[in-house]
Structure formats: structure tokens, C-alpha cells
């Protein structure tokens, strides 16, 4: 089961989740610093990323893990407030530049291609104080930050992700309020944030295109989270339509403007407009793009970056009471099949990734696809022999192989989440996704490979699984 020659095998991390050094060497506070320091049990046991894996001082240890796996690519994110403490280029923190220069240079010296995310949920607190992603002013702030990163690191970094999981960020931070700033705006905030995230991404892509691409010759995209959504009853027309609506609200709301035509899907526009009208709003709760904005947004990604973990079943759920919320706008409910095995929210459904990749190929004109995250957690305490977890990866690789060989999907890179056990947002350190175990009780934060790491290293060496289909 050999993968195509030159296939990229990677692992991923994100700044707030691994670095620690939350106020070291001039770093400014980010929204997760503020959110976790406020307590209130919004994060498991009020844990914080103040130290996390200590990667800010232990990069050499991370590099050893990367080399041990034999990764061809490594995906990590830049901390916006480590580079620009107040989020603007008014003050630039040289120590932050030095840290990321060392990571990039060490990777390249070791034949590893960096995939760099500009922004992975950790907005500078100074910008959140000015309205964050609910304010249109953020578009220019993000563009200036992106240009700063392109000009500082782009001579060596050729693969960029502007915004990590924009579709998760908009809902979790500004609709449900489960991520910072922690204030829910049901049925309104998520759409407002999405609108600004899409425009900020597009602006920064154009900046790269016009100012840096000719010289640097890199690629820029954003990453989107996608659960595969299957009709609960495949024979029910209403469930089939609900599943289509679900994927449209979940993925296409972001992907269609960027990859196809600069505008939201029709079903999203009509559902939200109709619900808004019933609820007495003077206009739709979904903002509209101007014709000029549509032109600016269309075609602003050089590859399709998607993050897949699991699958859900979908059925039609009429919004009789006119409740506010994204699920209510889509008129769906989702749930797992009771026969699926799971840890936390991740149910083992390997065939979902193949269906998702085929959907992206068919809907988005057969783009180059990177899976920028995929993984399976263990609950804490986690055994080092994680043979069961490796089974999730093994079955996933079988499905990726089928997608490439049988469906002719143009998948070029796979990133396992994560290189290290780390701070998993609201779950704190209770959910361990690492290929390497990290002892969070030990100040030295030793990294020890799980069985999965050893097995993944074999896959990378062989460029695929040894077994047949």
C-alpha cells in the first residue's frame, strides 16, 4: 500500500497548546491566557497553557521527536502576541522572531518542510479588547500581521495556513461562547465572525499574491474543520436533505466563497433569511458580501486544507419554536451511531474521511488537498502501549490509500494531531492526542514515544502501510 512518491507525512502542534512561556521575553497576553486565568471551570480543572509542554524552552526536545518519526513536514503555529505583543506592528518582539527563526532553520537543516499557521485560536488580547472578530477593524490588523510574517519568514516558509479552523473559531468563540472571550451570541456572533474571518483570509492571500509570491513562490490557504455528516436514515429524503444542509452550513459556508465564487451557499442564505424573518429581524442575521468583496474573496486558496477526526449522523429537526442558533438555522440534529467506539467526542469512523475527501474533490474542482489535522485521543492517564489507538490511524491510512487510488483524490500531505500531548482547549490536559507522551507533573516535561509513534515512523519509512487493502 505505497502512497504516491513525495507524499508528505507530518505531525502538527499549535503555539498556545505546546509553547508555555506565556509571558516570557516580552510576549503579550493572548485571549487564552486571559480566559484560563479567569477560572470558572470553563477549562478542565481550571488548567492553563502557562507552561504546557514547555516548547518555548524545549524546542530541541521537540526536534528530536520530529527526527525520531522521520517526518517530511512539520506543522506549527506562530503566536501572534509573541511576535507582536499588542497585535500591531507598532512594537515587534525580536525574541519571538528569534524563537521561530530557530524552529524554521532547524527544520530545514534536517530536511523537514515547515507548514506554518499564522493564527491558531490565540488572538492577542489587545485586539479582542477592540472587538476581536466581531469588529471589521480586525481585517486590517490580521492583514498587517500576515504581511509581517510573510516578509520575516517567507524566504524559508513556502506553505502557509492563515487561519486555523475558521469555522470552529467563529462558532465556539462568538456563537456558543465556549472559547474566549466566552460571551455567547446565539445565531448572530458566529456569522459576524465568519464574515470577518473570510475577508481577513482573502485580504492576506491577496497581500501574499501581490507582494511576496513572485519572489517567495509559496502557497497560502486556510484550514477548515470537517466532520463527515451522513443521513441517519439513508432512505429518508428529509434526512438526506438535512445531511446536505449540515455539510453546507458546516464546511461550505467557508469553502464556497473562497474556492468557488466569493459568496455563501444559497441554502445557507435562504435558511437564515427565512428564520430571521420569522424571528422579527429587519434583515437576515447573515451579513452580505458586496459585489466587490465577492470578487476579492473568490479563488483565495492555493490548496484545500481540511481537518478530519470523526463522523456524525444527521436528521431533520424542524425549528418550530424559532430558536436562535446555527443548528436551528440549518434545522438539523446530529448524533453518533451507538455501535461506534469512541473516546470523548471522537467516534472511530474511518470510512468518513474517504467520503469527505471525495466530497471535496467533487465539490471544489479536484483541488490539491492537505489533511492538516487528524488524530485520536487517549484519556489521562494514558498507557504508552496505545495499540488500540494505533488501529484508528491504521484504518485511516487504509481509507486515505483508497481515496488516492480508487477515487483519484489529489491528497498530498497528511498531518497527525499531535506531535505531543498538549493543552486541548476546554479539555485541558485530560485528553492526550500526542504521538509522544508528555509528563505534565515533571518540570522537565519529558517526551516519551507511544507505540503509535513507533508505528507511524514505520509508515513514513515505507511511505505507506505494509499490508494490502
Curated annotation (Swiss-Prot):
<keyword id="KW-0963">Cytoplasm</keyword>
<protein>
    <recommendedName>
        <fullName>Cytosolic beta-glucosidase</fullName>
        <ecNumber>3.2.1.21</ecNumber>
        <ecNumber>3.2.1.46</ecNumber>
        <ecNumber>3.2.1.45</ecNumber>
    </recommendedName>
</protein>
<dbReference type="GO" id="GO:0008422">
    <property type="term" value="F:beta-glucosidase activity"/>
</dbReference>
<dbReference type="GO" id="GO:0006683">
    <property type="term" value="P:galactosylceramide catabolic process"/>
</dbReference>
<dbReference type="InterPro" id="IPR001360">
    <property type="entry name" value="Glyco_hydro_1"/>
</dbReference>
<dbReference type="GO" id="GO:0004565">
    <property type="term" value="F:beta-galactosidase activity"/>
</dbReference>
<feature type="binding site">
    <location>
        <position position="164"/>
    </location>
    <ligand>
        <name>substrate</name>
    </ligand>
</feature>
<dbReference type="GO" id="GO:0005975">
    <property type="term" value="P:carbohydrate metabolic process"/>
</dbReference>
<dbReference type="GO" id="GO:1901805">
    <property type="term" value="P:beta-glucoside catabolic process"/>
</dbReference>
<dbReference type="GO" id="GO:0016020">
    <property type="term" value="C:membrane"/>
</dbReference>
<feature type="binding site">
    <location>
        <begin position="424"/>
        <end position="425"/>
    </location>
    <ligand>
        <name>substrate</name>
    </ligand>
</feature>
<keyword id="KW-0443">Lipid metabolism</keyword>
<dbReference type="Pfam" id="PF00232">
    <property type="entry name" value="Glyco_hydro_1"/>
</dbReference>
<feature type="active site" description="Nucleophile">
    <location>
        <position position="373"/>
    </location>
</feature>
<keyword id="KW-0378">Hydrolase</keyword>
<dbReference type="GO" id="GO:0006680">
    <property type="term" value="P:glucosylceramide catabolic process"/>
</dbReference>
<feature type="binding site">
    <location>
        <position position="309"/>
    </location>
    <ligand>
        <name>substrate</name>
    </ligand>
</feature>
<feature type="binding site">
    <location>
        <position position="417"/>
    </location>
    <ligand>
        <name>substrate</name>
    </ligand>
</feature>
<comment type="function">
    <text>Neutral cytosolic beta-glycosidase with a broad substrate specificity that could play a role in the catabolism of glycosylceramides. Has a significant glucosylceramidase activity in vitro. However, that activity is relatively low and its significance in vivo is not clear. Hydrolyzes galactosylceramides/GalCers, glucosylsphingosines/GlcSphs and galactosylsphingosines/GalSphs. However, the in vivo relevance of these activities is unclear.</text>
</comment>
<feature type="binding site">
    <location>
        <position position="17"/>
    </location>
    <ligand>
        <name>substrate</name>
    </ligand>
</feature>
<dbReference type="InterPro" id="IPR033132">
    <property type="entry name" value="Glyco_hydro_1_N_CS"/>
</dbReference>
<dbReference type="GO" id="GO:0004348">
    <property type="term" value="F:glucosylceramidase activity"/>
</dbReference>
<dbReference type="InterPro" id="IPR017853">
    <property type="entry name" value="Glycoside_hydrolase_SF"/>
</dbReference>
<feature type="binding site">
    <location>
        <position position="120"/>
    </location>
    <ligand>
        <name>substrate</name>
    </ligand>
</feature>
<dbReference type="GO" id="GO:0004336">
    <property type="term" value="F:galactosylceramidase activity"/>
</dbReference>
<dbReference type="GO" id="GO:0005829">
    <property type="term" value="C:cytosol"/>
</dbReference>
<dbReference type="GO" id="GO:0017042">
    <property type="term" value="F:glycosylceramidase activity"/>
</dbReference>
<comment type="similarity">
    <text>Belongs to the glycosyl hydrolase 1 family. Klotho subfamily.</text>
</comment>
<keyword id="KW-0326">Glycosidase</keyword>
<feature type="active site" description="Proton donor">
    <location>
        <position position="165"/>
    </location>
</feature>
Amino acid at each position: 500500500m505505497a502512497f504516491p512518491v513525495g507524499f508528505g507525512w507530518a505531525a502538527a502542534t499549535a503555539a498556545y497548546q505546546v509553547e508555555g512561556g506565556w509571558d516570557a521575553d516580552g510576549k503579550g497576553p493572548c485571549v487564552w491566557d486571559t480566559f484560563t486565568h479567569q477560572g470558572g471551570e470553563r477549562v478542565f480543572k481550571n488548567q492553563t497553557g502557562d507552561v504546557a509542554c514547555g516548547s518555548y524552552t524545549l524546542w530541541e526536545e521537540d526536534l528530536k521527536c520530529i527526527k525520531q518519526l522521520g517526518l517530511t513536514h512539520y506543522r506549527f503555529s506562530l503566536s501572534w502576541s509573541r511576535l507582536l505583543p499588542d497585535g500591531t506592528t507598532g512594537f515587534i518582539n525580536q525574541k519571538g522572531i528569534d524563537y521561530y527563526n530557530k524552529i524554521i532553520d532547524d527544520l530545514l537543516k534536517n530536511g523537514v518542510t515547515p507548514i506554518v499557521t499564522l493564527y491558531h485560536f490565540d488572538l492577542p488580547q489587545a485586539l479582542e479588547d477592540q472587538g476581536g472578530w466581531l469588529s471589521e477593524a480586525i481585517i486590517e490588523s490580521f492583514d498587517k500581521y500576515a504581511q509581517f510574517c510573510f516578509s520575516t519568514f517567507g524566504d524559508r516558509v513556502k506553505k502557509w495556513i492563515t487561519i486555523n479552523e475558521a469555522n470552529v473559531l467563529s462558532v465556539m468563540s462568538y456563537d456558543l461562547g465556549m472559547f474566549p472571550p466566552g460571551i455567547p451570541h446565539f445565531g448572530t456572533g458566529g456569522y459576524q465572525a465568519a464574515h470577518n474571518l473570510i475577508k481577513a483570509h482573502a485580504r492576506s492571500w491577496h497581500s501574499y499574491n501581490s507582494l511576496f509570491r513572485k519572489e517567495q513562490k509559496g502557497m497560502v490557504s486556510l484550514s477548515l474543520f470537517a466532520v463527515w455528516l451522513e443521513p441517519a436514515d439513508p432512505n429518508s429524503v428529509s434526512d438526506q436533505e438535512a445531511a446536505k444542509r449540515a455539510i453546507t452550513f458546516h464546511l461550505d459556508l467557508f469553502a464556497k466563497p473562497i474556492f468557488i465564487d466569493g459568496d455563501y451557499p444559497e441554502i445557507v442564505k435562504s435558511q437564515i433569511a427565512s428564520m430571521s424573518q420569522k424571528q422579527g429581524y429587519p434583515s437576515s442575521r447573515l451579513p452580505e458580501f458586496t459585489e466587490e468583496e465577492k470578487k476579492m474573496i473568490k479563488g483565495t486558496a492555493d490548496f484545500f486544507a481540511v481537518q478530519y477526526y470523526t463522523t456524525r449522523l444527521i436528521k431533520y429537526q424542524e425549528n418550530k419554536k424559532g430558536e436562535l442558533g446555527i443548528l436551528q438555522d440549518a434545522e438539523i440534529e446530529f448524533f453518533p451511531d451507538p455501535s461506534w467506539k469512541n473516546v470523548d467526542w471522537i467516534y472511530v469512523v474511518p470510512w468518513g474521511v474517504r467520503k469527505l475527501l471525495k466530497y471535496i474533490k467533487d465539490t471544489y474542482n479536484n483541488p490539491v488537498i492537505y489533511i492538516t489535522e487528524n488524530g485520536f485521543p487517549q484519556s489521562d492517564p494514558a498507557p504508552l502501549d496505545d495499540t488500540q489507538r494505533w488501529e484508528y490511524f491504521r484504518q485511516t491510512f487504509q481509507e486515505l490509500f483508497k481515496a488516492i487510488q480508487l477515487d483519484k483524490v489529489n491528497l498530498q500531505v497528511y498531518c497527525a494531531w499531535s506531535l505531543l500531548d498538549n493543552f486541548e482547549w476546554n479539555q485541558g490536559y485530560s485528553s492526550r492526542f500526542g504521538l509522544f507522551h508528555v509528563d505534565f507533573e515533571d518540570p522537565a516535561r519529558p517526551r516519551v514515544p507511544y507505540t503509535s509513534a513507533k508505528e507511524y515512523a514505520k509508515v513514513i519509512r515505507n511511505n505507506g502501510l505494509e499490508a494490502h487493502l
